[in-house]
Amino acid sequence: MPKKLVPKDYEYIHLDLTTGEINFTSFNSLEELQASLKEGQIFFHKSVIFEEKPESGEIYSPKLISQIYRKEQELFEIREKSKGHPLPVTKKLLKRGQGTIVCCGIYTKELLKNVAEKGQYDTQCDDLNLGIFHVRAHKPLGIAQRLVHLPLPEDASSAAVATENLFGLIRFILVNDPAKKKIYLPISCFAIEKRIEQEHIIGYSQKDSLALSQRAYYEYKKDGTLIGLVALIGVDVKIDGKLGFLYHPVWREKQWALKFNEKMFYCAVSRAEKEKVFKPPYYLEPTAIIVDVTETPVKRLKNTSEDYLWLEVSQISAKFSLFCAQNNLKLEKADSKNKSPFVALSMESISELTGEQKRAFVKILNIPGIIFSSSTLAKARLESKLQYIGPALIEAAADGNFTDVVDIINRIEPLYDYKEILKEALKTQRLGTGNTPLQEAIKGQHTSLVKYFSSLSASLKVINHKNHQGLTALNFATAIGSSPAIVQELEWCSQ
């Protein structure tokens, strides 16, 4: 039997750049680690959980680790000069439409380069063929955030997600092997101070598109039992009486952390702290994470097949309560003993609403804390004449990544019937008239939309938008990848 390797606190991988030798070493504290650093040496945190020690040391490639280290050093220096301000870093490292994403490389054979420019990149993992990395850029209030989605095989029960931090370095690659033989939790340098207990994993349900927009993941036991939610920026983890803390390098203080165990999860942020931490330009949309969640009965979490929308009582108007009553939406109050300021609304019941009802739902509940919408849509909901899909489409078009059209539709599907929206757009001649391929695409799957746009000839020129001829100038601008023309046509469509 292979020897089971369990990581210890402050156990690091030591890389000697001169010899290329890789060893494991432990320190009693970060201060001891820093004091021992010498030129030409790298220590990076061995925050990886696996059941068998790999036979080959290739996953700890010296070249790969050194590249990660240099990127970490660059980010650290910029961060120190900017005194923790994230914007100078994003401007330097994540220019619109281009950039380099560096993967931590554990169980991944190669770096991901120029992913944002190409839009997709093929890679291969040791044990699971994870397919194509789909890269999407989000820029809520000027802060760049990229998500890389790794779809598992069709028979997999969950998907793996790699998430870059705000500085463009992938911090997490979370893989849940459906066979439950191995669990990989590779994380790059200094991402975790304390380990997570081996019997727990962080998983992302493929049916749950919320995890992407929230930048949070449901936390499961290996047997599939739901424990709670895990935030990416800061998390206090308490398991079997042991407390650990996962943190984002920007927010080193424990001012914002979701705490959870098998009975409850809650946010440790007071309103005063939230206003201090999230004030502009540091502000991250409340949609990016669940905030101000107080103690919640475990019975709300046991049914893993159904998700709940949590709403603060103070945000619920009489008009919204009436809407829920008229449309059989049951607002479930938390245990009165806990005096929770939240109520729960079943996501399944929301999904059963018609397109018209969903739009009315969002219009009535016009609050920034609605957790299942993207930050872009939450920020610009109903403010654009394009309505609903317009703001996100403009953002996607500006980045020149047109697979985002499908991604956007997937993300807002819990709110809006995309077929109904596009049919309405066709009626108003915004996305084409007549029996166009787009109409045929509407009848098919989401991917048909991308096939439709990509099928247009790249040699076609942008025509006058008043002369549609069955296709709008937006379609042509999309086909030739002209971002300025796309934005111009989207703005025209909104008039």
Curated annotation (Swiss-Prot):
Lineage: Bacteria, Pseudomonadati, Pseudomonadota, Gammaproteobacteria, Legionellales
Protein name, entry field: Surface E' protein
Keyword line: Cell membrane, Membrane, Plasmid, Transmembrane, Transmembrane helix
Location (main, coarse): membrane
InterPro entries linked to this entry: Ankyrin_rpt-contain_sf
SUPFAM superfamilies per UniProt: Ankyrin repeat
Domain of life from the UniProt record: Bacteria
Chain segments annotated as transmembrane: 224-235
UniProt-annotated location(s): Cell membrane
Gene3D superfamilies according to UniProt: Ankyrin repeat-containing domain
Annotated GO CC locations: plasma membrane
Membrane topology: Single-pass membrane protein
